[in-house]
Amino acid sequence: MIRIELNEDEIMGALRHVHRVRQNKKEFNVTDKKFDKNNSSYSVNLMGRLGEVACAKGLGLSVDESINPGGDDGHDLHTSLGKSIQVKTSTIPTLIFNHETNFISDYAILVVLEGDKQLPHVDSAFHIVGITDRKYFFDNFTYHDYGYGQRLILSQDKLHPINEGFNINEISRLFGSAL
């Protein structure tokens, strides 16, 4: 597991990005689906963006700055060899997808927030926990209901761990696919 603390510029960049995303959604009358009854849509969006920034920082990748009315295309990061990654940020050590069709990237990475999910930008750190590919996820996930319907989950112990020195361009060896 890699622990990442974001600096002020990275946090402000994430805040600006989420503000632009929300302005874009308002302009195009796009309503967020709310999947966390104990948190605001804004905080959920911000926590996710901060997790993407932390993951990119920890793995030496660039974040996607594009903004689309319907949200991003599901691909949060890309390896230098063109493989796509979805970053899933949570407060619990479990990779969660709301629906089977939501895992569209080549890989998914779990990032866990250490801090207050309602104020994810204040005194927080992020842990890049583990990675899976689509095949392994769909072969090993279970269902869980957190109070708002069945979700597809994979616990931290079933993910391939990401530790200091992890090289994202070597993931083909982990999952047997060419990058």
Question: Each PLM stretch: what is its role?
Answer:
Residues M1-L81, K88-L179:
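Nucleic-acid endonuclease domains
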